[in-house]
Regions:
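Short alpha-helical
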Residues: 1, 30, 53-54, 96, ...
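Short internal alpha-helix immediately C-terminal to a glycine-rich phosphate-binding loop
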Residues: 1-41
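Short, flexible, glycine-rich and Lys/Arg-enriched loop motifs at helix boundaries
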Residues: 13-19, 71-86, 143-144, 165
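Residues at the starts of beta-strands that form the adenosine-phosphate
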Residues: 21, 44-46, 110, 135
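Alpha-helical segments flanking ligand/cofactor-binding loops in enzyme cores
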Residues: 36-37, 57, 99, 127
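Adenosine-nucleotide cofactor-binding segment
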Residues: 40-96
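Glycine-rich phosphate-binding loop and adjacent beta-alpha segment
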Residues: 96-164
Length: 167
C-alpha cells in the first residue's frame, strides 16, 4: 500500500514514463521491492539500491533494470548539489540516503519518502529545492482517508500490479 501511495504521488507530481531512471532505495525491503515491481509494471526504468549484493539478480527479476549498492546512495557529500541522475525516487531509507537523492534529482523531479531506517535526520540545504525545483513528498499510509485507500487498492489490482505477483 505504501509503495502504491509513493508511485501515485510521484505521478501526480509529474513523473512520466520515459523521463529517465527512477531510483528505489531500500529495494530489498517490503515497500522497496513492491515499488520496484509497480514502477516496472508501469513501464518506468527502475534502478534499485540495496546493501545486499547477493540480491541483485532477484531485484532484476522483479523489474529493476539496474542495481546499485547502498554505499553509493548513502555517501555524505560536502556538495549541496551533484550531477542530476534521477527522474524520481521512492526513498524507503531516509537519513543520508534521502539527502543523496535530493542532491541528485533531475530538475523538477520528486522523491516520495516513507522510510527512516537510515535515520530521521536530514542533512541538506535548500539548494535542491530552489535551484532545481525538486519536491519532497511525504508518504503516510497510516492516516490515509478511505477514498484514497479505495483508489489505491484499485490501482494495485490493475495498473500497479507487479507482474511477479502472478508467478
Amino acid at each position: 500500500f505504501t509503495a502504491a501511495l509513493s508511485v501515485d504521488a510521484l505521478e501526480h507530481a509529474g513523473l512520466i514514463v520515459g523521463s529517465g531512471p527512477v531510483l528505489v532505495t531500500g529495494a530489498t525491503g517490503g515497500v522497496g521491492s513492491v515499488a520496484v515491481g509497480m514502477l516496472a509494471a508501469r513501464g518506468y526504468e527502475v534502478v534499485a539500491s540495496t546493501g545486499k549484493a547477493a540480491s541483485s539478480d532477484w531485484l532484476k527479476s522483479i523489474g529493476a533494470s539496474d542495481v546499485i549498492m547502498r554505499d553509493e546512495t548513502s555517501a555524505e557529500s560536502p556538495k549541496p548539489l551533484e550531477r542530476e541522475r534521477w527522474a524520481g525516487s521512492v526513498d524507503c531509507v531516509g537519513g543520508s540516503t534521502l539527502a543523496y537523492v535530493l542532491r541528485t534529482l533531475n530538475y523538477g523531479a520528486s522523491v516520495a519518502a516513507s522510510g527512516l531506517t537510515g535515520g530521521n535526520g536530514l542533512a541538506t540545504t535548500v539548494l535542491p529545492f530552489i535551484l532545481r525545483g525538486v519536491n519532497l513528498l511525504g508518504i503516510d499510509s497510516v492516516q490515509t482517508p478511505i477514498a484514497i485507500r479505495r483508489a489505491m487498492w484499485t490501482r494495485i489490482a490493475t495498473d500497479l500490479r507487479p507482474s511477479w505477483l502472478d508467478t
